[in-house]
Design a protein with these regions (language model features):
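Short amphipathic alpha-helices and their capping/turn segments at secondary-structure boundaries
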Residues: 1-8, 85-100
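Glycine-rich nucleotide/cofactor/substrate-binding loop typically near the N-terminus or early
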Residues: 42-95
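Short catalytic helix/loop segments, enriched in acidic residues and glycine
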Residues: 24-47
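Short beta-strand segments
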Residues: 11-12, 57-58, 100-104, 155-156, ...
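Active-site rim beta-loop-alpha module in soluble metabolic enzymes
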Residues: 144-206
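C-terminal accessory domains and tails appended to enzymatic cores
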Residues: 4-6, 194, 199-279
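Active-site glycine-rich loop that binds ribose-phosphate moieties when present
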Residues: 85, 123-148, 156-160
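N-terminal glycine-rich anion-binding loops that anchor highly charged ligand groups
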Residues: 9-22, 34, 49-52
Length: 279
């Protein structure tokens, strides 16, 4: 590990940011799209990472939310943009990274009073369990980073995702962007306060070493149970290899390799997304 220049992987999402409470706020085609609020928060964090090597992976919706021009202001940032790609939210992670950062993450589906709660697909997935533990996107993706011995070191999101994730990964640095009080409501702190917290957290992260954090992994054999939003979607994904139908809406996969589990989950979301067009 290069102690003088940390290499940081940032997986970017939108729903966990301050200033947004509804789907229109995070939909690029919407007149209510909150790009200004997003960029203020993201730039504050990137400012604190000066001197690091940063890969920023735009992982919300079609992956086209962050303008390429951000790399002019922050020349130490490489931006990954665009839709369907391998490992989607985690594209490009490998053993060379010191830390993973999850920016703008949100609580898992079904979390009480959580702003825009969902897990991978708000329209198709009702719940996900891995080895009996209810999942959110932060935990699912942290385990994928663990395949490459990269720890989740920093989590930026609402209070609910931080509470969920810190129960399992208590050493993770975090910045609470907002207090969620309902599916489409949240309490926002003053912007100046949050921007300062984001920059200071990034500066603190740049002083840390990989050993300060935990590598998250699931013990084998790994079992994922996905509850789909309806029986049609369960019908569709049941055609996938390794998938076992549990009941009307639930399917299950067991495997020793978490990469297989992770890619199967992505395949389910893609199949269900395509089905919205066909049926």
């Amino acid at each position: 590990m290069n102690m003088s220049k940390k290499k940081i992987f940032i997986s970017f999402d939108y729903e966990g940011l301050a200033g947004v409470t509804s789907w229109n706020d995070v939909e690029k085609k919407s007149s209510d799209f909150k790009r200004y609020e997003m960029l203020r928060q993201l730039k504050a964090f990137l400012k604190g990472l000066e001197g690091c090597e940063v890969t920023l992976v735009d992982s919300h919706a079609a992956g086209d939310n962050i303008p390429w021009e951000i790399t002019e202001e922050f020349p130490y940032v490489t931006l990954v943009s665009g839709g369907i790609r391998q490992y989607y939210m985690m594209y490009g992670i490998d053993e060379s990274f010191d830390f993973a950062v999850f920016f703008g993450y949100h609580a898992g589906i079904g979390t009480i009073h959580a702003n825009m709660d969902h897990t991978y697909s708000s329209s198709s997935i009702h719940n996900i369990w891995i080895n009996g533990v209810e999942m959110n996107e932060a935990l699912i993706n942290a385990a994928f980073a663990g395949l490459f011995n990269v720890p989740l070191a920093c989590l930026i999101g609402d209070d609910k995702v931080i509470t969920q994730t810190s129960k399992i990964l208590p050493k993770v640095l975090s910045v609470e962007t907002k207090k969620s009080i309902g599916r489409h409501s949240a309490i926002m702190k003053p912007m100046a306060t949050l921007l300062n917290e984001l920059e200071e957290c990034a500066k603190e992260l740049s002083t840390k070493s990989r050993e300060d954090f935990e590598i998250f992994r699931f013990s084998s054999p790994i079992e994922i149970v996905v509850e789909l939003s309806d029986t049609l979607r369960a019908d569709l994904v049941s055609s996938m290899p390794l998938v076992e139908r549990v009941d009307g809406r639930k399917v299950r996969i067991k495997h020793d390799d978490y990469k297989v589990i992770f890619e199967a989950l992505l395949a389910m979301t893609y199949i269900c997304a395509a089905a919205r067009i066909l049926v």
